[in-house]
Amino acid sequence: MSNKMWGGRFASGPDAIMEEINASIGFDYRLAMQDIAGSKAHVAMLADVGIVSADDAADITQGLEAIKAEIESGAFTFSRALEDIHMNVESRLAALIGPAAGRLHTARSRNDQVALDFRLWVRDTIDALDGQLRGLQLALAEKAKLYAGAVMPGFTHMQSAQPVTFGHHLLAYVEMFARDRSRLRDARARLNESPLGAAALAGTSFPIDRHATARALGFDRPTANSLDSVSDRDFVLETLSAAAIAAVHLSRFAEEIVLWSTPQFGFARLSDKFSTGSSIMPQKRNPDAAELVRGKAGRVIGALTGLLVVMKGLPLTYSKDMQEDKEGAFDALHSLSLCLAAMTGMVKDIEPDTERMKAAAGAGYATATDLADWLVKALGLPFREAHHVTGRLVAAASAQDKGLEELALAEMQAVEPRINAGVFAVLGVENSVRSRMSYGGTAPANVSEQAERWLGALAAEPASKI
């Protein structure tokens, strides 16, 4: 038996494997609310311009509301035989209200319908992710304010480089997530055009009002080219690109949490809420939440790569390949949402060991740059010469297994005779961070000010997410 939604020219139904590979209801059921919203706007417009009667439009709208209630309550039965969410909804509508349901699809194709539904879903998801990113920024800024003066090592090449503060380190991620929010908002602004009314690819001969449906659905305007309207998936690619970058930021932070929680670092501790044990080693406390955030970044990046490969060879306009646009996007953006929730919880939960971090900050000659700067400022040495002198002093200290601050003044003067006792003021890690007063630097006063600025800005954001 052929599919009654499209099977008029077919003498028989599809093969079982064709049904299996063709059906998308197993994942596009997630578009149900967007599909119903689009259909309600469409039928209201059809009635306004006189294409369907007011009575039919009212019956269709009432039926769509009933279907929405069934889906929300869990009473709706999704049918694989009906392929996708669009045909599942339309079939149920016909069962509820009869022949009038057949008028809903006037001047519309599944091509513009799915493009609309997916845009609405991505837009809703961006709004939700933006709210989660804001929550993570707040948690980071609050913790940064609390630990604005807690000294820790700053690293380059995973080697101790210069002392920074824990608060400063956390604020670096606040900045990263701000850029992620900006990218998602940019993607949202570009996707906010309605493809509804483009029909299959060429538009329609019916006197529809695309501007009316665009307004009703919260879009800025209708799309301007019907071919592009049904074949465009840039809005998904751009959103996945922004999501992948955000996932990379989360993964980098997760990696640091994993390192910090090792006995070898011992910089921070996650509570039992975000740790697990071993089935064989009773002493273990594994930072599994952070490891899973790190791992899920690969899924988000993979979804972006996968969709790029799907789209790269498609001529205009719609091809069935484009059904593969959704499953990866659903998974990737859900994974990102989980990661944001987990990371926000870990940030609130994490307990830094400030004494251990401070001790580590003083190891590895992390104040060598401060010494070089002092030689420039106090003695007038060119920086390259100061760099060379400092290197010789580090070598002298290292040969004796001492810190720079443990060298005697006479030992320093053996390298550079003009060094005086004032040098010792810059060799402590707390003095080092206090001196970094340049804009964006790690001085605790700077960090406190930046944390307050972020907390104020985030608190002042309007209640609506975008």
From Swiss-Prot:
Gene3D superfamilies: Fumarase/aspartase (C-terminal domain) (1.10.40.30), Fumarase/aspartase (Central domain) (1.20.200.10), Fumarase/aspartase (N-terminal domain) (1.10.275.10)
Signal peptide: none
Enzyme Commission code: 4.3.2.1
Gene Ontology molecular function, alphabetical: argininosuccinate lyase activity
Protein location: Cytoplasm
Enzyme class: lyase
NCBIfam families found in the cross-reference section: argH
Protein name: Argininosuccinate lyase
Origin species: Methylocella silvestris (strain DSM 15510 / CIP 108128 / LMG 27833 / NCIMB 13906 / BL2)
Gene transcribed to yield this protein: argH
